[in-house]
Amino acid sequence: MHQIKFVIPFLFCLFCAEEKTKEEWWHKKADVMVEKQIERRGVKDPQVLKVMRETPRHRFIPPHLEKMAYNDGPLPIGEGQTISQPYIVALMTELLELKGDEKILEIGTGSGYQAAVLSALVSEVFSIEIVKNLVDSAAVLLDKLGYKNVTTRWGDGYKGWPDETPFDGIIVTAAPDEIPQSLIDQLKTVEFHPEPL
């Protein structure tokens, strides 16, 4: 009986140590990503760099691609969609020039990664995704990871989210030929930073 009581805590300690080592490994990968891919390309906002280090990108991609999570490029997330390259996520976030009290609209939730990054920097994030399976998965994951100020919904992002206007900023992760007037009308003030994805 005493041996069983000893073995269970011992196995639990082994599991905890393994999880801690794994998380430390992910943190190192994120540090390298920020230093070599993001800072070197000119992203300077210390808050954006901090959040890019802290947001667990590996949780937002399919498990079989997990080891490539912090690589310098987009990755497939299913349904013919991708998670954006880390540098692009950081750049789009920096271009919003966030102060912390903003309400941001994201067009194209994908796996939820960009919304998670924004969540730590703004008051509220509203994210629309046209692919139902993706938005459903992203909503579950964002909630599980504790991103409570992100609201997601399924729909046509180019129509925006009229019930929640005006927005301080809008990130469009898909590249339309032209910016829909319906989105422009939902901004508090209009300023464009077109960036190739």
Each model region followed by its residue ranges:
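Hydrophobic h-region of N-terminal signal peptides that target proteins for export
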Residues: 9-17
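Conserved nucleotide-cofactor-binding alpha/beta core module
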Residues: 97-197
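Class I SAM-dependent transferase core
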Residues: 16-105, 116-117, 121, 136, ...
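Generic cytosolic/nucleocytoplasmic N-terminal low-complexity/intrinsically disordered segments
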Residues: 4, 17-19, 187
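Sec-dependent signal peptide recognition
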Residues: 2-9
